[in-house]
A protein has these predicted regions:
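Second RecA-like catalytic domain
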Residues: 1-236, 296
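Extended alpha-helical interaction scaffolds
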Residues: 81-99, 103-107, 113, 121, ...
Length: 296
């Protein structure tokens, strides 16, 4: 019946529902197949599904920070999970299970959460295999990994204020990068964060540098385009305008020159007649145009 068909899952929805993580995280894994980074996406999304396995006891903050700093990536906290995962895999192969538990304790890692992380990864890996999604064996590029993650974090992007260590996020939210982040000391111009946590202020946790150019292709359903200064350009032989592209109010493209004919054909026709035909401001080989100029 009609109601049942309204609730039918799309092919993407059907795949999302099979992955054992939140749909937002599942979306990242599915996007990752286009970017050759399924392995990294599974490691990161399974880590984001659980409480952070890295512990930071109140009385051992400095010691635990030093242990965890080994895994930091100066541009991405998401890649710190990949570094940690690779380290744990190597250690687990080399050590007995008791020695591995002890290692987790001395590295300020919660053993049970590490196991939970590995379990979710294994489940993800199984479903991905059943869906026929190939898993990369070579490490993926930074850009590819973060574009895949971006599909699930579009409402968590931010642009740095020029003179402050603060970011403007979606719908004008203001947040700062969490002090535990590898990006805290040198915050980049644009970031995405895994979550926004409100304590004394709004903090962005698990952050990474992004290029605003990556946002537009994966955010088509959220994009707003505005146009200004439509004007005739002799060299282009067309009406051009300045396009601004925003997502949740953030200017991912501040000013791009575009052909205006598809946007407002009536105005373009009017400007063409006035500038090209009446004023003769046109570079063309059309015979009628040369004849027109002779009549002036």
């Amino acid at each position: 019946d009609e109601q049942a068909s309204a609730y039918k899952l799309t092919p993407l929805g059907r795949q999302l529902s099979q992955l054992p993580v939140d749909p937002r995280l599942a979306r990242m894994v599915l996007e990752a197949q286009k970017h050759g980074c399924v392995r990294e996406a599974m490691i990161i999304t399974s880590a984001l599904s659980i409480q952070d396995p890295r512990e930071r006891p109140m009385d051992k903050q400095q010691a635990s920070d030093e242990k965890h700093r080994r895994f930091h990536d100066k541009e991405s906290d998401f890649l710190a999970f990949v570094n940690l995962w690779n380290y744990l895999g190597e250690q687990q192969k080399a050590l007995s299970s008791n020695a591995f538990r002890r290692l987790c304790r001395t590295d300020y890692l919660n053993y049970l959460r590490v196991r939970e992380w590995q379990d979710i990864y294994t489940q993800l890996r199984q479903v991905v295999k059943e869906l026929g999604i190939p898993v990369n064996s070579e490490p993926a590029e930074y850009r590819e990994i973060h574009i895949a993650l971006l599909t699930g974090l579009l409402s968590h992007i931010g642009m740095k204020d020029a003179d402050k260590q603060e970011y403007t996020g979606a719908r004008n939210a203001r947040f700062s990068i969490f002090p535990g982040s590898g990006l805290f000391k040198k915050p980049p111009k644009w970031v995405m964060v895994a979550e926004l946590v409100e304590t004394s202020r709004l903090w962005g946790r698990i952050a990474a540098r992004i290029d605003p150019e990556w946002v537009e292709p994966v955010a088509q359903h959220l994009i707003k385009r505005t146009y200004s200064e439509p004007h005739w350009e002799r060299a282009q032989g067309a009406v051009m305008a300045t396009e601004k592209v925003t997502v949740y109010g953030l200017p991912i493209v501040a000013a791009r020159k575009v052909n205006y004919s598809q946007i407002d054909p009536a105005l373009c026709r009017e400007l063409f007649i006035r500038h090209a035909l009446v004023e003769g401001d046109w570079q063309t080989r059309h015979a009628f145009f040369r004849e027109n100029l002779k009549l002036r």
